């Protein structure tokens, strides 16, 4: 089975090809560039480098958000288009879960984090048990201070992952002190190969029903809904 994994949900663009237990190819960049013009060429380049054709793909896995509204839409739309045109199954994985997978060797709780502005973050809580990643608290859009208060009550060390941890480093350290473990730079990019393996275990979804998971409405959408009340 050849799995194609696609993640454009944040600044990180990640494409991977995985066959069973082997990572055949993986492409990762962290650039403030438009994924809409780079994602598909990256898929083609990876397939060509591996002497594979689109028809060799057995399954597609996509990061469904949260993250950048535009980025999430680009990845989900691309993945759905490929799955439909190639007639292969598709599965989606939380972008936070994919990032949390980088904490495989951490003995404690894992909090992947994306900045959501105005003191808020997209985050969730995970941990590894017997080599498998498990959710402890569901993904959410929450005030960082509120989230840190919840983590403080758990009394365990927490590994924070994601480039946006740098924005909130001082607040995290002030509230959690020794409980907080800041991930190394190499762990802040979500790995599309990890995304592929997470998705390999998930059931296939209806390609027409699969939608992004933003965790909150875009500001413009929220204002429009409020105006209709």
What are these regions, as identified by a protein language model?
Residues 59-90, 95:
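DPxDG-like acidic metal-binding loop motif
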Residues 3-5, 61, 71, 110-113:
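Short glycine-aspartate micro-motif
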Residues 1-66:
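N-terminal beta-alpha supersecondary unit
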Residues 16, 122-126, 213:
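Conserved hydrophobic/aromatic positions in well-ordered beta-strands
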Residues 181-229:
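Acyltransferase
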Residues 22, 34, 89-188, 219:
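Surface "functional belts" at beta-alpha junctions
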């Amino acid at each position: 089975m050849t799995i194609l994994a696609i993640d454009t949900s944040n600044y990180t663009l990640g494409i991977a090809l995985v066959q069973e237990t082997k990572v055949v190819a993986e492409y990762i960049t962290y650039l403030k560039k438009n994924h809409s013009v780079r994602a598909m060429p990256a898929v083609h380049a990876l397939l060509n480098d591996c002497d594979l054709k689109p028809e060799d793909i057995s399954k597609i896995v996509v990061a469904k958000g949260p993250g950048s509204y535009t980025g999430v839409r680009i990845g989900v739309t691309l993945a759905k288009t490929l799955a439909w045109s190639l007639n292969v199954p598709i599965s989606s994985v939380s972008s936070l879960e994919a990032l949390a997978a980088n904490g495989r060797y951490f003995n404690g709780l894992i909090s992947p984090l994306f900045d959501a502005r105005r003191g808020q973050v997209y985050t969730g809580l995970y941990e590894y048990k017997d080599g498998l990643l498990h959710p402890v608290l569901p993904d959410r859009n929450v005030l960082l201070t509120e989230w840190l208060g919840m983590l403080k009550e758990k009394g365990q060390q927490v590994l924070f992952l994601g480039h946006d941890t740098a924005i909130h480093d001082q607040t995290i350290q002030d509230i959690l002190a020794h409980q907080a473990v800041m991930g190394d730079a190499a762990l802040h990019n979500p790995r599309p190969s990890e995304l592929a393996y997470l998705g390999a275990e998930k059931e296939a979804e209806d390609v027409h029903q699969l939608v992004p998971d933003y965790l909150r409405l875009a500001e413009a959408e929220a204002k429009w809904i409020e105006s209709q009340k």
